[in-house]
Amino acid sequence: YKSGFMSTINFSKDGLILEKSDLTTPDAIKIHKNIKDSLESDAIYIAMEASSHGLEQDRLIGLDIDYAILTSFSHDHLDYHGDIQSYQSAKEKLFLDLNPKKNIVCIDSSFGKKLHSKLLKNNKETYSISIKENADFHASFEKSPIGLKVNLKAFEKNHTFELKTFSRYLASNIICSMAVLILEGVKLSEISKIAKDIVLPQGRLERIIKNQQVIYIDYAHTPEALECTLKELNNMHNEPIWCLFGCGGNRDKDKRPLMGKIAQKYSNHVVLTNDNPRDEDEMDIINDILSEIKEMEQISINLDRKDAIESSILEMERNHINGVLLIAGKGHENYQEVNDNLYELNDKNIINSL
């Protein structure tokens, strides 16, 4: 089936990327234009990300939504919403105010559990997904040569298949998409056949081998995402883990010390650097990250992200550290935002240029 797609990364029709995206959820006029363009190209399905900003600003008003999906919930955007309750209320608008025909909710977060119960109480057709407990769609994982071996149970039927990702976090999102296909009548056996051919987004626990050094690039920029990613790497590797990250300027400040503590807890060494400082003082951001860290022995600071990445790789090579480097926060992004200016910068390109 032909399809259209609007996301943090781009707007595409039938797999062809038409334009890059600055907003996770475009304004209402742009949304309807993209939908019109997709339909004129004979698209049958259109998928889009619904951000809390977009929901709060009613950018999705007027859409006829077949499936609303909650993949996860994490501490983010409190600079905009003010508190976690307001952030949750914005998310709930997709499910309670826009009246989708069917709801799919991952219940592996406390908010997911609460939302799932609320939807059922409101007699909304709702399905649960979990990688932790019993649910309508339940997935368990094992390591495989290409990534993860998945056992998916749906409506009393089990199927095993492989995914080309090492991330259970990302695999859970894929299961949410598969749930839509199953509810649309596609057989689980058919989905299993194509699972290993699924093309994953760039910068989502993307593995790179550089001079025998194992490096991962990941978009993790919230406490929950960083913790999930680091836990994943600790499960996958016995070697020392280095974590390089920063926090965005003029954004949710409350998450900074949380991310600092998480990075220290699950890493052997932490490199703090810039991640879109915007017009906020760079060292103020770093000091916020460090505010609840007691021991500084395993912490280093290099505000120049390009140099921080290059230096970390070279230092690990020079000192024969047979470890794993996680470069977190920017993922697919191709820029660094400083004082209202965008400078070209891509983590993967920096690695490949060495």
Put a short name on every predicted segment.
Residues 1-13:
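Short beta-strand-centered segment that lines the nucleotide-binding/catalytic pocket of NTP-utilizing
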Residues 99, 123-125, 179-354:
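ATP-dependent carboxylate-amine ligase
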